[in-house]
Every structure is written in structure tokens, then in C-alpha cells.
Amino acid sequence: VSNEQTSPVDPQAEVAPQVASHSLKHAVILGSIGFVAACLSSLAVGAMGEVFTLPPEIVQLGVGAVPGGDTQKIIVAASIAVFYRNSALWLATTGIIVGGLFGFVGGHGNNKSRIVRTVCAVIAGAAFGAAAGIHAVYYGEKCLELLKTGPLSVPESMVMQLHGTTWLIFGLGIGLGSALGSSQRRSAINKIAQGMLLGGIAAAVGGVLYPFVAGIAIPLIDPSIPIPLESNNRLLWMSLPCAILGLALGRRS
């Protein structure tokens, strides 16, 4: 009779690799969904164009206006106000698309929890997206004010802050929406905090990386524009944060 004893198998040791593999697979799926959402968002924003425009009476004021005069200041102020509204609408639309896709595909649970999660992600994405759009224009105004003082271009650190903070706000909303729809309510507060923190940081990383990647991929563009209007530039600006955001939220799930 053999005296050898077989060591007991640790169930956790067998499950851990499977969990890690599933988590990685889910991260890749959500990262891909993030890229698709960015493509759809860029197309939607391009199709929408400038929904809000200058009133005809303001446009008429610009005919023959003296540069630097009071009339010119009124036109500039009105143009900025229009850009605020368009930017809020553009990123709110982006938040709806990204939040909706992440909410529908991400996470677990039955059909009811999937619907709840999607609705929460759409609402939070729209609200925080609009806030991100407003912030982008506000910070963009700071960049313009800096250029008036003498520098020929906006410092890289300021450009990184512009896009990083804009996407930070956006990511907070997507992370919040994903956590609000969770079917597990015992640790709801922790899940919300983790979701917002992870979403905000992940999207901010994509925003910070954008100027560097854009400088290589599209070297002739101006990275200090708050919300890029050129299609390829806008797609790059949206896809980096959304893809990284998807990877992060998918890994957490």
C-alpha cells in the first residue's frame, strides 16, 4: 500500500485563471465597443453640425464692423455662447451613445437589470457629457486668453489639462451610469465610487494621450482646439478615451 497522499486541490487556484481570462475577454470586448461608440459619436456629431447658430441680427452687426470695436466684442461673445451650446449638445450626444452601448453590453444580470443599467448610463452620460462640453469651451477660452498675452502656441501642459479634464468629467458620468445599473445593491456606494473613479481616470488618460498621438498621426492639426471639428481629428479625439474607458470598465466587471 502506498503511503503517498494526494494533496487537496484548492478550488480557488483553479477558478482564478478562469476569472482572469473572462475579465480580460470582457475588457477587450468593452474596449472594442468603446471604439465603435466613438466612431458612431463622431459620425453623429458630424451629421448634426452646428445646431445652434448666430441670430440673423447678430450676423448683420458684423457687416462692416470695426475690428476691436464694441460691435465686434458683441459678435465674439455671441459666437462663444453658441459654441458653448453646440459643444454641450455634441458631448451629450456622445454620452448617450457611449453610455447606451456600455450599459447594454457591459455587466451581468437579467434583461431587467440590463435595461435599468442602460437607462442609467444614458442619463448619466448625457448629463456629464453636456458638462464636459461646457468645460471644454471654458478651458478653451483660457487658452485663447493666454495666446493674447504673447505666446505663439498653447503650452503642452495646458493642452493636456484641457483634454484630460474634459474627458475626466465625461468618464465620471459613464462610470456612474454603469454602477447605478448594478444588480448588486449591498455595496452600491462602493460600486458607484469605484465606477466613477475608474471611469474618470481611464477617460482622462485617453484625453491626455490625445495631443501626443495626434501630433504623430495628424501632425498639421492644432491640438488646443477644445472639440475638434475635422472628422479624422474628432474621431481620434473620441476613440482614445472611449476605448481606454471600455478596457477599464470591462476589466472591473
What is the meaning of each model-derived region?
Residues S2-S253:
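Juxtamembrane/disordered regions of integral membrane proteins
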